């Protein structure tokens, strides 16, 4: 079980990333385009740096939806490997069964 503060901080970051996503994409496109004048490119880079640090999607962490475990996250389920195993054994994940060969 992850600390509640870590889970809450990650949720806050998700909201900040969503809020600034369009502006970041716009600025990054300006910086990336070769036809952008050098002065505009420098202004766009400065504006991008002025955005909050948590607006970058790289700072998000994939966490288990049930208990917030940060490692062993399986995207398909949104759960950690430990939680997937437990739920699969109990039959709570439709279409998932223990393989044997």
From Swiss-Prot:
GO molecular function: rRNA binding; structural constituent of ribosome
Keyword Ribonucleoprotein recorded: yes
Segments of skewed composition (Basic and acidic residues): 61-70
InterPro entries with a match to the protein in the record: Ribosomal_uS14, Ribosomal_uS14_bac/plastid
Subunit structure: Part of the 30S ribosomal subunit. Contacts proteins S3 and S10.
Alphabetical list of PANTHER family matching this protein: 30S RIBOSOMAL PROTEIN S14, SMALL RIBOSOMAL SUBUNIT PROTEIN US14A
Name the record gives this protein: Small ribosomal subunit protein uS14A
